[in-house]
A protein has these predicted regions:
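Positively charged, small/polar-rich N-terminal and surface patches that mediate targeting and assembly
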Residues: 1-85
Length: 85
């Protein structure tokens, strides 16, 4: 599954997510089409069994987050990452 996460708290979301799940995550600067506020789009690929726990974690960090879930047909490359510590 692929998550597209729209948040104003990218650093906090990424830190919480990476420290617990050790998956890669990408961050892109964005501007809200309605609010015109600066925000961020985060993209990551997860296993379906992780979905509920990850959504809960992200919502704890940012109560205003928007999370769009896509079914991923195929995924190639490293899935689990070694800790950066």
């Amino acid at each position: 599954m692929t998550l597209q996460i729209t948040t104003e708290k990218a650093e906090e979301v990424m830190k919480a997510y990476v420290s617990k799940y050790h998956h890669g995550i990408s961050c892109v600067d964005a501007i809200g089409g309605y609010s015109h506020k600066k925000m961020y789009l985060l993209h990551t690929v997860i296993s379906s069994y992780e979905l509920n726990d990850i959504v809960q974690l992200i919502q704890e960090v940012d109560e205003n987050v928007i999370i769009n879930v896509f079914k991923t047909e195929d995924f190639y490359g490293g899935f689990y990452r070694e800790s950066l510590d």
